[in-house]
Amino acid sequence: KDRFDLWCGLDLSDYGRSSFVKTAVEELKRCHKMGAKGVGEVTDKGLGVYVAFQTNMAEGIHLNDPLMSPIYETCAELGMPLNIHVAEPYWMYLPDDKYNDGLMNGKKWKIDMSIPGMQSHEQLIAQFSEAVKNHPNTLFVACHFINCSYDLSIVGRLLDEYSNLYVDMSARFGETASIPRYMKKFYTRYADRILYGTDNGMSAEMYETTFRILETDDEHFYVPDYHYHWYYSGFDLPDEVLRKIYRENFIRIMK
């Protein structure tokens, strides 16, 4: 219990009924009483809100929907951060052609925009931003750099605008390790707002790769399991930045 925190999901089983909000809030309070410290991974990849590893989706309800507001406010009252997965990497919205630089993953995880009601990447990011703005007392942790690693200025702008927003780096090492100088500046500027994360299993090799990228100045190495054609380079982050992203930021938001 000294090494792990318990988090919970959301009960979306009453979606479509008038009891939807009441059920979700009551279950959230019950989980908190049982020891849950946070909520997540709450996800919207375009068709509606759901929670990872659960079968219920609130189809058509997106992160800025008024029905989500009581849930966010309850999280604020209980001091429970929300881990949010919004959209997918931008390559997954692009055509499967030679101009798609992330085709290796983009084709496998392709977002089908022909599905009725499917939200675009831009719509999803705007909806998430509105939710963060409208609930300043709720702490949001957007995983995967808000799925904006293709243009981290978007992440920086949102971090500048909303003090209740944090991001994690999970599963976005391959997308960022090709621009080490930019990333060193980005991590240093937002060192108080970034959390370490992986989302790539539990192997020692995986962790060693993330440490190599964050901590060393190694250049031009390859990680085949990351499925990208470019080489990686280390960010050589200062110790003070590493302490924050590995440990101190998490301790602060969980108080």
Feature locations, PLM:
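Short charge-dense sequence patches
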Residues: 81, 102-108, 133-137, 196-200
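Generic structural signal for well-ordered alpha-helices
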Residues: 24-28, 68, 72, 128-132, ...
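Residue-level signal for alpha-helix termini/capping positions
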Residues: 32-33, 73-76, 133, 160, ...
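H/E-rich (His + Asp/Glu) clusters that bind or coordinate divalent metals
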Residues: 116, 122-130, 137-255
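A short, flexible N-terminal coil/short beta segment enriched in small residues
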Residues: 87-99, 130-134, 138-144
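Active-site gating/metal-coordination segments in enzymes
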Residues: 1-110
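Short helix-to-loop capping/linker segments positioned immediately adjacent to catalytic or ligand/cofactor-binding
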Residues: 59-63, 115, 142
